[in-house]
Amino acid sequence: MIFKRQIQSEIQKKMDSGKIILLIGPRQVGKTTLIKTLLSESDYLFLDGDETTVQAILETANTEVLRNLTSNYDCVFIDEAQRIKEIALKLKIMHDQLNIQKLIVSGSSAFELNSLMQEPLTGRKWTFHLHPITWLEFEQEVGYLKSEQVLEQVLITGLYPEILKNPYPLFTNLLKHSKKKGC
């Protein structure tokens, strides 16, 4: 089940603006899924900042290396970008010196707090914040009746996409934990 996110149309409108799209949010709220959905009909380069090889390449890359890496793509998506040292400078180079039509970056909330990210990208980015699924998004996907039927469960688990898809491991874990604590 993939939820249509309210922010999706806002991001879509800015995709051809020539600015970097920066999507920030906590872990497991669906940042990667949302961007991949938006890019589903595009040919794009996906760089996963969790991969040490990607980190090593981007951290040491000069302009020529970045050009060679991205030259066959009009769109580049860097996921988990907060894991890449000096990423703001690399993004500035990609934006200013390379002809990348769409540059999309996602990362955790701590990513934006990094003051090094702000200065180099001033005026070069649109920042969007993705939160767990809203009640409206949930209700639109599953319908009013179903949403009311699972309200109590949702109040316990929250509206994180993975938990909504498969809540039973969480409940099993909570039950096991409560038995250990004597609750």
Model-identified regions with their sequence ranges:
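Short regulatory helix/loop adjacent to the ATP-binding pocket of P-loop NTPases
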Residues: 111-126, 142
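N-terminal pre-Walker A segment at the start of P-loop NTPase domains
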Residues: 1-16
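Conserved lysine of the Walker
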Residues: 31
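Short glycine-rich substrate-engagement loop in P-loop NTPases that contacts/grips substrate
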Residues: 45-75
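Hydrophobic anchor at the beta1->P-loop junction of P-loop NTPases
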Residues: 23
